[in-house]
């Protein structure tokens, strides 16, 4: 190494401009931006206390770290090596084949970089080899405990998984890939970020689960001695209750533990007063009592309805009753009562015409039932009449005359004509 007496001895740059045109070789003595030059530029790590902004023509002193140059006519992309890496960790990023407009500046993602420096770009084909020597450059305090990241050998970053920087609780912005960022989070917001926003960026081991917080960390949550010690009454609490769930205070706020008493008495969540209570939430405390009272009322009314005096009359009081002593006949219509009264009278005008029967009925319908049930069946006690049997070929309900011994009609005869051989037969002889 050279003596570190002057900046020109410490930062000596050799640029091979033989393969470049006159317009493509920048002058290192003049200030230029790496954005405008296709020539690869040196890459280094700057911290807030060890290095200053790399103005190429006027930079600060580097007391412990120097840049070595490789003698010869090699190109600049292989001429720089950082001779001060204190650890054995390597830094490899899939930044090779990205277009110029797709590249993002490194200071936007690494808080260890100075925001005032000129934006440096990772060269597309630079080997990025470093010497791991004992004398090294101390890391910034916000960038400690970085694990080793494997170098991406494939130049096409689109076909490889993005290399993620290690997760850290001090700077949540470093937990995401620097190339696949849906949105940027400035590093200055890391100190003011609440615990709710910190949880997605933390490791499983570093994150604090809400159910594992010790009671001593949250603070005592003890109910008051009585309900009268509440700062507000229950009705006031229901009036100030919002219609939608309230986001509870974050764990990272400095207001202290979030307890149910603090929500009741106000505090950081006093904006709930702006909400109007909904009818469903307002009646939530009275609904169970109201439903219980309705159930009790229904039970009482059902018991009262089962009592005999409260039961409705199944048989309605009819207007037409039979006046015969000992008869409890009741009827809905007057004609029904008249028909019933004929059964009590001694007059029976309806007589069976079948020879040998001569049974009389007070009602015609009873006589017809007698014909159907008595004389139309074979083998009965009464005489069988074929003209009254619907299944017989001699069926004729209008026939009135003499019958043969087997019950078949004798056409042309009359009821008054004597039956042949009837003198030798009795009434029991008709029974078969």
Swiss-Prot record:
Superkingdom of the source?
Eukaryota
Where does this one sit in the cell?
A: Nucleus
Q: What is expression of this protein induced or repressed by?
A: Expression is induced during conidiation, after conidiophore stalks had formed and had begun to vesiculate. Positively regulated by abaA. Negatively regulated by velC. Expression is also controlled by acoD.
What residue spans carry the region label Disordered?
22-72, 238-260, 388-432
Which InterPro entries has this protein been placed in? Znf_C2H2_sf (IPR036236), Znf_C2H2_type (IPR013087)
User: One matching Pfam family, short form?
Assistant: zf-C2H2
Q: Which keywords fit this entry according to its UniProt record?
A: Activator, Conidiation, DNA-binding, Metal-binding, Nucleus, Repeat, Sporulation, Transcription, Transcription regulation, Zinc, Zinc-finger
Which Gene Ontology terms cover its molecular function? cis-regulatory region sequence-specific DNA binding; DNA-binding transcription factor activity; DNA-binding transcription factor activity, RNA polymerase II-specific; zinc ion binding
- Compositional bias of type Polar residues: which residue ranges? 62-72, 238-252
GO BP terms: autolysis; conidium formation; positive regulation of conidium formation; regulation of secondary metabolite biosynthetic process; regulation of sterigmatocystin biosynthetic process; regulation of transcription by RNA polymerase II; response to starvation; sporocarp development involved in asexual reproduction
**Low complexity bias spans:** 29-44
Which cellular component appears as one GO term in the record?
Answer: nucleus
Phenotype of null mutants: Prevents the formation of normal conidiophores.
**C2H2-type zinc finger locations on the chain:** 320-344, 350-375
Q: PROSITE patterns, alphabetically? A: ZINC_FINGER_C2H2_1, ZINC_FINGER_C2H2_2
**Domain characteristics, as noted in the entry:** Both zinc fingers are required to induce development.
What does this gene product do? BrlA, abaA and wetA are pivotal regulators of conidiophore development and conidium maturation. They act individually and together to regulate their own expression and that of numerous other sporulation-specific genes. Binds promoters of target genes at brlA response elements (BREs) containing the conserved sequence 5'-(C/A)(A/G)AGGG(G/A)-3'. Controls the expression of the conidiophore-specific phenol oxidase ivoB. Controls the expression of the hydrophobin rodA.
Please state what the protein is called. C2H2 type master regulator of conidiophore development brlA
Q: Which organism is it from?
A: Emericella nidulans (strain FGSC A4 / ATCC 38163 / CBS 112.46 / NRRL 194 / M139)
**UniProt gene name:** brlA
